[in-house]
Design a protein with these regions (language model features):
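Intrinsically disordered, low-complexity N-terminal regions enriched in serine/proline/glycine
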Residues: 13, 19, 62, 85-88, ...
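Intrinsic low-complexity, glycine/proline- and repeat-rich
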Residues: 111, 312-315
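A structural boundary/capping signal
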Residues: 1-115
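A polyanion-binding, active-site-adjacent surface
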Residues: 116-306, 310-313
Length: 315
């Protein structure tokens, strides 16, 4: 990857969430780099090495990179000036910068977003299912939640969902879809919101016909596990039969045989649940006990209903 490509990708990832705390209220899309210099310097250092340097600009601490006798500064435009004096700098180690917990957390969030964006590029360039699917217009296949310990795994992009709205579980009018309403009722049982969770689709593009689901699932599996390896969730809730078949990678006769059980798949704990579509009579009723028994606390999974260890199925 070249520097200009990294700069372009990062420019689409900056947000209030990754902005330095004292700058959050001033952050906006017209000044995306505001409050990002330290974590961006760390990421540039991850990919290109060199030195991380610190200067003062208008009495404000500012970080940039020095690579092969070249100054690299992706966030200089936040100062709205071309006259930055880079000469009087001090070298800073990664350890010195990351000792601050807030900086470390923001760095990890931005780095994760970057890695997932690079995987999205691979998905967008994939042509394995070209005659069977329509691509995501936004090339975005991950709904980034506030906490990464739980991932909701859907079947495939719905025609009226986030492939058009750009926001998982919402339509183009930003109205929660019927399946989202049911899912939120279930998440209420464990004190979470849809926005708290990461959301992925087992199939990354929109299948033009359901008969292609199995083939597309096979082709997309490598991308799914690339994403999961970066997110590192503690639990994955797979919605319905198709998503479950894709991730479990073994055959079962009836979906009811696996619902609510915990499977260890490549180090990830997967719990199949009924799809929250309100069309299904089991969308809430069939999942209620599963959610009541699921207690995600301090990033660990405890199955608390039966006062005994639940069997973990390993494949």
């Amino acid at each position: 990857m070249k520097l200009d490509k990294l700069e372009k990708i990062l420019n689409n990832l900056y947000s209030k969430e990754t902005c330095y705390p004292t700058c959050k209220n001033q952050w906006n899309n017209d000044n995306k780099t505001l409050g990002h210099c330290a974590i961006v310097a760390l990421i540039i250092n991850d990919y290109f090495g060199g030195d991380i340097c610190k200067i003062k600009v208008n009495d404000i601490s500012h970080y940039f990179n020095h690579i092969n006798d070249k100054i690299v500064d992706f966030t200089s435009d936040q100062f709205k000036t071309d006259k930055i004096d880079y000469s009087n700098y001090v070298l800073k180690t990664r350890e010195e910068i990351l000792i601050n917990d807030d900086t470390r957390i923001r760095y990890e969030i931005l780095k994760l977003k970057l890695k997932l964006s690079l995987i999205d590029e691979k998905i967008h360039d994939c042509s394995a299912c070209s005659c069977m699917v329509e691509k995501f217009p936004s090339s975005k296949t991950v709904s980034f939640g506030k906490r990464r310990d739980i991932v909701i795994l859907g079947e495939a992009p719905a025609n009226n969902g986030w492939r058009k709205s750009g926001v998982a579980w919402y339509d183009i009018n930003h109205k929660l879809l019927p399946s989202g309403v049911v899912l939120q009722k279930l998440l209420d049982l464990i004190n979470l919101t849809i926005e708290d969770t990461f959301f992925l689709e087992a199939i990354k593009c929109y299948p033009v016909d359901r008969k292609y689901l199995n083939k597309c699932g096979i082709n997309c599996k490598k991308f799914l596990f690339m994403q999961l390896e970066e997110i590192k969730p503690k639990v994955i809730l797979s919605l319905g039969d198709s998503a479950t078949k894709t991730i479990l990678d073994f055959k079962y006769k009836k979906f009811s045989e696996v619902v609510g059980k915990v499977f260890d798949i490549k180090g990830f704990k997967v719990i199949p649940i009924y799809h929250p579509s309100p069309i299904s009579p089991l969308s809430y009723k069939g999942n209620e006990e599963i959610f009541k028994n699921l207690n995600i606390k301090e990033f660990e999974i405890n199955w608390i209903a039966s006062n005994r260890k639940i069997k973990i199925f390993q494949y």
